[in-house]
Amino acid sequence: MTPNMLGAYGDWANQNLPDPPRLSFRQPQFQNLDSWRALARARYRECLSGPAPSAKPIALVQHQIEFDGLEIEHLQWQLPYGPPTEALLLKPAKARGKLPAVVGLHDHGGNKYFGLRKITRITKDPHPLMLQHQERYYSGLAWANELARRGYVVLVHDTFTFGSRRIRLADVPGVIRNNQVEANPEAEDEIKAYNAFAGAHEHLVAKSLTCAGLTWPGIFVNDDQRALDYLASRPEVDATRIGCAGLSGGGLRTVMLTGADERIRCSVAVGMMTTWRDYLLNKCHTHTWMCYVPGLPLELDYPEILGLNVPNPILVLNNRQDSLFTLPEMERADQILSAVYRKAGAADRYKASFYEGPHKFDAEMQKEAFAWLDRWLKG
């Protein structure tokens, strides 16, 4: 027996995963792309078990600035649940006409105190922890700013449990926070203490949501779709040319949002591609509770969620030494998506690249990602 997350039960549990799953487009009975996608997407949305969709959010402009060649709006909107959502909308200064747009999806990174600030910059003096974060994962770049400067409208918002949407210490019982309080929230020691609490709190969030008939992905997909609603409504945005992109937890959100919403015309998922088998046997200990959708692995393999948007173009960027996944299962995910796109007659609209190095979305990878978005949203 190969050591795995379930020990002697691992092989038995793995045998419960059909390959291909029931609603995989790789199944021979599925020949009509449109009818398959309607069936599979409906089942995916059912498994997500998210909140009832609400109206397009009414965004209030908190303030506007011009920074480093960009016009930036600080926005806030209220969803039917939780604290207000903070967001940034970035676009080239003095831009004219309709522009392509991207929903920029921030990562997890074991840091729930921050959300949108992980991939944006609106001051020459950002928080020191965000400088460290961007240096570690993004070659020191705020990639949402970099993309906006290329001629995009980029919307970056805090999603469920991050940044402005985080669960506040004062709102949970003292027994689960060791009576910890937030006296000076922007202090580094308090941020690190909050993130330790938030990491330990994840299993309680997942349990509680299950008791409400909800899933964690169902909630963040709803958050992200409402942001998409707002972005598509902006007068400077061409709603037929909207994409999404993100690293890690942002890559997860890219996968899930792309699978759920046909308005996403181009996607770049970075550092978040593998198979359910990899999660099951090898790597669930390296991942957040945000990943899991009960029942879905019987219907679609993890990469096939992204494939629900075929023939819209998708780019997957992997790192060979990424400790969050095993390389064989990253490669198997590539084979699965390649098969889906070939069968749909859209092989040229799918690409996966494998880079050397650990978990990251560095400058070289950003260059490929931006070129892909340019090809399909500007071409």
Regions inferred by a protein language model and the residue ranges of each:
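Mobile cap/lid helix-loop segments that gate and shape the active-site cleft of serine hydrolases
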Residues: 199-214, 218-227, 266-306, 311, ...
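Cap/lid segment of the alpha/beta-hydrolase catalytic domain
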Residues: 105-222, 232-233, 280-281
